[in-house]
């Protein structure tokens, strides 16, 4: 056998090695069946479990905001909200957007708790320290020390005389 035939034989054996043997020694090799789960199947299972909890719909909710510790917000616009009071369970379904807390201002201020308000104050302090252009303060610009108005007034008086 030449080297090309050996290389082809090795590739063929490696391809066969990937297959899963089902059954005994004499049975042919078969590919393992992979079942792909879809979001619709998960949604059906979730809805059936919610029916077991006897959930009730809560109408009239326009938006739901879930605030994370890192300052991001999961925002649901016109969600379907269901609750089960005996099970202490709430279900929020709908399309969700991940947004920064600064994008949601000022409408989200009345929804913030004390922890989120302190986080927001820290963010505001960081922004003011950086300045409007996002860079630190310029160190090249000297600070004003004296009163320049008095010198200009003296010049105008000298010009009048």
UniProtKB/Swiss-Prot annotation:
Changes seen on gene knockout: RNAi-mediated knockdown mostly results in embryonic lethality, but embryos that do hatch produce larvae with a large number of apoptotic cell corpses, which are first present at the comma stage of development. Surviving animals are uncoordinated. RNAi-mediated knockdown results in increased neuronal and intestinal cell death and a reduced number of male tail rays in larvae. RNAi-mediated knockdown in larvae results in increased survival and mobility in response to a constant temperature of 36 degrees Celsius, when compared to wild-type.
CDD domains recorded: NAC_BTF3 (cd22055)
Biased composition (Basic residues): 27-36
Residue span of region Disordered: 16-41, 128-161
Alphabetically ordered keywords of this record: Cytoplasm, Mitochondrion, Nucleus, Transcription, Transcription regulation
Compositional bias annotation for Basic and acidic residues: 150-161
GO cellular component, one term: cytosol
Residues of the NAC-A/B domain: 40-105
Domain of life per record: Eukaryota
Location within or outside the cell: Nucleus; Cytoplasm; Mitochondrion
Gene Ontology biological process terms in this record: embryo development ending in birth or egg hatching; negative regulation of apoptotic process; negative regulation of protein localization to endoplasmic reticulum; regulation of cellular response to heat
One Pfam family hit: NAC
Binding partners and assembly: May be part of the nascent polypeptide-associated complex (NAC), which is a heterodimer of icd-2 and icd-1 (via NAC-A/B domains).
Role played: May be a general transcription factor that can form a stable complex with RNA polymerase II. May prevent inappropriate targeting of non-secretory polypeptides to the endoplasmic reticulum (ER). In response to heat stress, plays a role in modulating the unfolded protein response by negatively regulating the accumulation of proteins such as the chaperone protein hsp-4 in the endoplasmic reticulum. Required to suppress apoptosis in neuronal and intestinal cells to promote development.
Family per similarity comment: Belongs to the NAC-beta family.
Listed name of the protein: Transcription factor BTF3 homolog
Source organism phylogeny: Eukaryota, Metazoa, Ecdysozoa, Nematoda, Chromadorea
């Amino acid at each position: 056998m030449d080297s090309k035939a050996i290389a082809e034989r090795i590739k063929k054996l490696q391809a066969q090695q990937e297959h899963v043997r089902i059954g005994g020694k004499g049975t042919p090799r078969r590919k393992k069946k992979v079942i792909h789960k879809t979001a619709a199947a998960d949604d059906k299972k979730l809805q059936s479990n919610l029916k077991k909890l006897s959930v009730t719909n809560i109408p009239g909710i326009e938006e739901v905001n879930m605030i994370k510790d890192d300052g991001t917000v999961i925002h649901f616009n016109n969600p379907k909200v269901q609750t089960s009071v005996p099970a202490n369970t709430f279900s929020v379904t709908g399309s969700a957007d991940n947004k920064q807390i600064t994008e949601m201002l000022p409408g989200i201020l009345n929804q913030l708790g004390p922890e989120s308000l302190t986080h927001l104050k820290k963010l505001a302090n960081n922004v003011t320290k950086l300045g409007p252009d996002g860079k630190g303060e310029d160190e090249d610009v000297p600070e004003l020390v004296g009163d320049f108005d008095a010198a200009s007034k003296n010049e105008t008086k000298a010009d009048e005389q």
